[in-house]
A protein has these predicted regions:
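Conserved phosphate-binding/catalytic region of the ribokinase-like
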Residues: 3-4, 149-150, 201-310
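Conserved beta-alpha-beta core of the PfkB/ribokinase-like small-molecule kinase fold
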Residues: 133-210, 228
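Proline-centered loop/turn at the N-terminus of a beta-strand
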Residues: 2, 157, 188, 218-219
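Conserved N-terminal subdomain of the carbohydrate kinase-like
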Residues: 47-130, 310
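Short beta-strand scaffold segments in enzyme catalytic cores
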Residues: 39, 87-91, 228-231
């Protein structure tokens, strides 16, 4: 297995427009950052698996089907009979930027337990990936951190996306503390230009990533929206330009970027990776993200390998 992702899969109720009376219209799309990444990487040629928890309901069954249809191994997905599948309402403004409202108190994804994540699954993966949404509450917080620590000991490369959603946390201070907690376990980190100052206190990519690298993180990406990506690879830093596109909806763009990058990095060794090779991978990831951004929804918008290479 190339990439195992752990965390939330949920229903994104994504605004698609308004009717003649001005009432917003919504589509029920599959979402959740770790699930998004698993699909993005799978469509681009990687073998991926997802571990998370859904409710014993129609949405839960639908999400499992969508992941399986996209060749994501869902044998590790758990079903919770007592808690419903999580939903988020995603409103999109005229520029394509998103606003999230989560319906998530005591929902299935938060109920992921240590026992739901086997050593066998962790041992089989080259890369084990997670985000911070599963760190917002227990038992999923303890389960996710425990899995990352176990995977690290078993030799996996650990990747992490803080993926800050303000309305999922008690307050900003708690969010920052919990988002920082896994950093010493992480080999490859992706943050947005909005998350960098939360974690480091600075908007400067050079000094911010230098600070993050003190945790032992070997490769750091700072996504800059339409402006591409800044990277720190050991002592080397650089920038790879974005790919211009007409914005439809930015939902899933960051997950597509990271999934695309990891679909290539899972075939490389960080010890022997060159800067030229890395920049080629990031150009590929930027193109994949631009295609997603030009469409609507997260998983439905993600490109195939032929579309990115074409």
């Amino acid at each position: 297995m190339d990439i195992l992702t752990i965390g939330e899969v949920l229903i994104d109720l994504t605004q698609t427009g308004k009717d003649a009376r001005g009432i917003p219209q919504f589509a029920a799309n599959p979402g959740g950052a770790p699930a998004n990444l698993a699909v993005a990487a799978s469509r681009l040629g990687a073998q991926t698996a997802f571990i998370g928890k859904v409710g014993a309901d129609a949405f839960g069954r639908y999400l499992k089907e969508v992941l399986a249809e996209n060749k994501v191994d869902v044998s590790g997905m758990a079903v919770d009979a007592d808690h419903p599948t999580t939903m988020a309402v995603v409103s999109v403004d005229a520029t394509g930027e998103r606003d999230f409202s989560f319906y998530r108190s005591a929902n299935a994804d938060v109920m992921l337990c240590k026992e739901d994540i086997s050593d066998e699954a962790l041992k089989a993966a080259k890369i084990v990936h997670f985000g911070s949404v599963s760190l917002t509450a227990d038992p999923s917080r303890t389960a996710t951190l425990d899995a990352a620590a176990r995977a690290k000991k078993l030799g996996a490369t650990i990747t992490y996306d803080p993926n800050y959603r303000a309305n999922l946390w008690k307050n900003k201070e708690d969010a920052i503390a919990q988002m920082k907690a896994p950093l010493p376990l992480v080999d490859i980190l992706k943050v947005s230009d909005e998350e960098l100052p939360l974690l480091t206190g600075t908007t400067d990519c050079e000094s911010g990533t230098a600070q993050l690298a003190q945790n032992g993180i070997r490769l750091i990406f700072v996504t800059l929206g339409a402006n591409g990506v800044f990277y720190r690879f050991g002592e080397k830093t650089g920038h790879v330009a974005g790919v211009p596109c007409k914005v439809g909806d930015t939902n899933g763009a960051g997950d597509t970027f990271f999934g695309a990058a990891l679909s290539k990095l899972c075939k490389e060794e960080l010890d022997t990776l060159t800067v030229d090779k890395l920049e080629g991978i990031l150009a590929f990831a930027n193109k994949a993200a631009s295609i997603t951004t030009s469409r609507h929804g997260a998983i439905p918008a993600m490109p195939t390998l032929a579309e990115v290479e074409g």
